[in-house]
């Protein structure tokens, strides 16, 4: 009888049975899958898209895969029949935000016995902000001050909630009464529940520009690559700021922070030392605290203040949605690889390099 938590040895046993000449790159058709599939094609791999019925159109229209697995809902990927189908095609899963949200952390850790690129055991850390804080503190990365409960709010604060929500339900407030008022508003919208109240993560609001930094850590070369940066389009806050302040007050509109899209950004060159330092230190401490660490893509979401200092507020311990901004490469990936290196393609390049070195097990969990 197997243990509750999927072990590295179990994954290695699956990988040993794979036909290494017929590896298939696979992920859920959502979030940031398009460049995963295109990157796999560019690196010469077969592709499989797992699509929820009714959500397959983009992946069919862009000819994203040779094979499609259609499911009623994404969580059906946990069914043993589908898992066996994936293993039979020598599938390697690329995890992203929708994969984590829909498949579920418990199932990924305990039931989903298909090899994935990256560390399945660190995915829970990105969802639990106290664990993120531990990583930031160990890596000496500045973070916003945490406020210990709604009754302690005495300044402008950002209120967030765990999980890959795309900013849905986040809000800014400066008082306990404001917290209660906005919680009620979000509950009425159906974005939060009463149970979420106890899960609220409250931190000081840091004014600055958003920089989401996209890294790739290769366990084969022990190097961290900075491949791109982005910032987010958020509704309705980005629309509200176009309204004159007087009209905003009169309209009485409440800002929300739902991510609707992303656009690329380039930092001033003098800031890159900080960017590399944060990525290097985070990868180093993650390997010690949550072995084998941050394998593959990860993202540090930051604000850059007017003192030209990055303050980190979240991480993604897998491919982040902002990687969609460089499907054909970014200015930073161009410096390393020339044209056409998306994060999705970088995953497939890592698989190709691991196969050539007979080290596929080293990049999978």
Curated annotation (Swiss-Prot):
UniProt-listed Pfam families: DUF1246, DUF1297
SUPFAM superfamilies membership: Glutathione synthetase ATP-binding domain-like, PreATP-grasp domain
Secretion signal, residue range per the UniProt entry: none
This protein's UniProt keywords: ATP-binding, Ligase, Magnesium, Manganese, Metal-binding, Nucleotide-binding, Purine biosynthesis
Top-level lineage group: Archaea
ATP-grasp domain location: 120-352
Entry binding sites for ATP: 150-212, 234
Biological process annotations from GO: 'de novo' IMP biosynthetic process
Cofactor binding, per record: Binds 1 Mg(2+) or Mn(2+) ion per subunit.
Cofactor(s) of this protein: Mg(2+); Mn(2+)
EC number(s) recorded for this UniProt protein: 6.3.4.23
Residues that, per the record, bind 5-amino-1-(5-phospho-beta-D-ribosyl)imidazole-4-carboxamide: 31, 98, 262
Involved pathway(s): Purine metabolism; IMP biosynthesis via de novo pathway; 5-formamido-1-(5-phospho-D-ribosyl)imidazole-4-carboxamide from 5-amino-1-(5-phospho-D-ribosyl)imidazole-4-carboxamide (formate route): step 1/1
GO molecular function: ATP binding; ligase activity, forming carbon-nitrogen bonds; magnesium ion binding
Function in brief: Catalyzes the ATP- and formate-dependent formylation of 5-aminoimidazole-4-carboxamide-1-beta-d-ribofuranosyl 5'-monophosphate (AICAR) to 5-formaminoimidazole-4-carboxamide-1-beta-d-ribofuranosyl 5'-monophosphate (FAICAR) in the absence of folates.
The protein, known as: 5-formaminoimidazole-4-carboxamide-1-(beta)-D-ribofuranosyl 5'-monophosphate synthetase
Lineage summary: Archaea, Methanobacteriati, Methanobacteriota, Stenosarchaea group, Methanomicrobia
Encoding gene, per UniProt annotation: purP
